[in-house]
């Protein structure tokens, strides 16, 4: 009897809840930290990015229309599913060069839980009832911005990714994520978790590929309302900021901090990608 040939995973894109190959048919080789080849990942094109933005926009009304409590439950479910696949994430973190992969997996799961807990507390803690000199009620409430582009950090391919995606979607935004070019397999594994969770298709869209090729198109896309440039390389930051200014995108860059530091998680990372609306209402006689 011949020896069984194991089934190799093909690292595809994640767009609209599905796993398509790049429309260009391109892929690029991914290497382990020791230089050994690991896999081939799909190399997303400009058209793939456009498709991801369309999927994110289509998913926005349903996701933003859910109650904050329900969104928190959905994020908690993601943490539950990651817990069940922790050995896979641990092995992939080790391949990516993590010195303590168990710590990295624990921190990523805990970050989902932390932001899930904030889902139904943002409006109460950061929204306000404003005193005004007149017969009016005046309220300020947070609302999601819309479609958010995210450039994931290169060196923290799991915790860094979760730390950018979780605060963006818990507030009701939908996202188009450029995964770490160097270690994209962890992003693909996270996409597989999201696909089997309660996160609606299109809320998180993950593209693997060449960062320098995709960032300009993400930053300049007119239907992207905000962009998190935390993972943009220094040499691309000025051009990214200029491209984002064309449609007055909200541009956010997380503070420089160790992602394992509790200070790296903050409710202000949620509101950085939200808008605050002030409403006036007459009191009546």
Features from the language model and the residues they span:
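Conserved small-residue-rich beta-alpha loop and adjacent elements
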Residues: 117-200
